[in-house]
C-alpha cells in the first residue's frame, strides 16, 4: 500500500505487509460497511459482495468501492484478504474459492483488531445496550474535543454514520460483538460489560456457562493496568465478578454499585437521575433518552469519562444534548387522522431495534411510563428462527404486555426454517393465553386495515425488530396512511 495515500495522524493503521486489495463478503451490513469505509479512506482498494443494494453499499460505491450483488468466485479476483460477516455461510462460493487460492479469510473482528491495534481502545460489550452505550461514550469524548475514532453497530444521528475516523490518533471507541465470539480478537485498555443474557448460545455449544466464560476471557484481554466497568444489576455479571483478575468498577441502581444511579424519573423522551460516585461530586443528569436501561448505558459512559478525567460539565452537557441512535426507541412519525366517525385519531410511531425478550420488555416499559394514556400497539417481526425457538415462551410472555400485537413473518437472516419456530408457532403460543389482542400478518397488504381497525383516539405504535420491519411499515402502513389522510 502507498503510505502517501493515507493520513497517519487520522487513523493509525500500519502497512499490512503487501495487503492492498481487501474484499468484504456481506459488505452491506452496518458493521461490515463501516469497517470497509475506514479502510477505503485509509488508502486500501475495497471490493465487496452482498445480495441487494442499500444505503451502505451506495455510500461505499460513491467513495470508490467496487460492489457486486451476487456471490460468485470471480468477485475475489486480485483480493489479498477476505473479510466475512458472521451471517455468511462457509459454503459461500467466494469463501470456497479463497481457501483454494490460500487467500486469508478473516472475521470482521480480526480486521477491527488490526485497525485499532495501536490505539487506546475502549470496547463496549454485553448482550444488550452495546450500540447505545458506544454512541454515548463517543458523544461525550467528541463534545469534549477529544476527537476519537468510532466503530459502532448503529448509526448515530449526530454524524449520520456508525464510524468516524478521529483526528486524535489516541482514542478508539469500539462496539465488541459476542455473537460469533470474534470479540476475543480485541485487546482493549478499558472494557464496559453492560449485561450477559442467553443469546447467540449456538455459538457457545448451546451453553450459557460457555458464554459467560467467553466474557471472562475477553475481560482478561485487558492489560494488567486495564479496567473493566461492569453493570452489577445483572445477575450473570454478578456471578463472574469473583473470577475477574483486573481492576473493576461496578455501576447500576444497586446499592452495592461503585457508581450508583438514584432518583430516576422519565418524562416522555427525557430521563432525569443522579449519579453517585466514590470521592467525586454527585452528578445531576438530564439524559435525552428515555428508559431505565438508557440510564444504565449513560452511567457506564460516565464511568469511562470520569476515568479519563473529562470535565463533569462536559459530561452533563453532552448527555443533555445526545441525539440518539437510529432505530433505538426512535420517534419515526406522528399523524393525526380523521376517522369515519369524524373523531380525530393520534398515532405516534416509534422504531426500536430490540429483538430479544428483555430488550422488547424495556421498550414496552419505556412506552408505558412515557405515555401512560396512549393505547400501545406493536408491529413485531421476529428475528432469526434460532432465537424464536430458544425464547418462544419468553416472547409469548413479554409480548402479552401490549394492548394490540401484530406479528409478521420471521426475518430469517440467512437461517433455514426451524419447525415450530416460525411466526405461526409464536402466534399460536400467545393465542392460548390471551386470545383477542394478537393478529398474525402473513399477507403484508392486510397490515394497514388490521391496524386501522384497532386504533383508539390516542395511540403509540412500536415498530419492533432487527430485520426490515421499519421498511415494511413505511411501505405497507405509512404510505397508505398518508393516502388515507388525503
UniProtKB/Swiss-Prot annotation:
One of its GO terms (cellular component) is cytoplasm. It comes from the Bacteria. Disulfide bonds: none annotated. The keyword Ligase applies. The keyword Cell division applies. Its EC number is 6.3.2.8. It catalyses: UDP-N-acetyl-alpha-D-muramate + L-alanine + ATP = UDP-N-acetyl-alpha-D-muramoyl-L-alanine + ADP + phosphate + H(+). It holds the Pfam family Mur_ligase. SUPFAM superfamilies: MurCD N-terminal domain (SSF51984), MurD-like peptide ligases, catalytic domain (SSF53623), MurD-like peptide ligases, peptide-binding domain (SSF53244). InterPro entries: Mur-like_cat_sf, Mur_ligase_C, Mur_ligase_C_dom_sf, Mur_ligase_cen, Mur_ligase_N, MurCDEF_pg_biosynth, UDP-N-AcMur_Ala_ligase_MurC. Keywords: ATP-binding, Cell cycle, Cell division, Cell shape, Cell wall biogenesis/degradation, Cytoplasm, Ligase, Nucleotide-binding, Peptidoglycan synthesis. Its main location: cytoplasm. Pathway: Cell wall biogenesis; peptidoglycan biosynthesis. GO terms for biological process: cell division; cell wall organization; peptidoglycan biosynthetic process; regulation of cell shape. GO terms for molecular function: ATP binding; UDP-N-acetylmuramate-L-alanine ligase activity. It is found in: Cytoplasm. ATP binds at residues 126-132. PANTHER family: UDP-N-ACETYLMURAMATE--L-ALANINE LIGASE (PTHR43445:SF3), UDP-N-ACETYLMURAMATE--L-ALANINE LIGASE-RELATED (PTHR43445). Belongs to the MurCDEF family. HAMAP family: MurC. Cell wall formation. This is UDP-N-acetylmuramate--L-alanine ligase. It comes from Buchnera aphidicola subsp. Baizongia pistaciae (strain Bp).
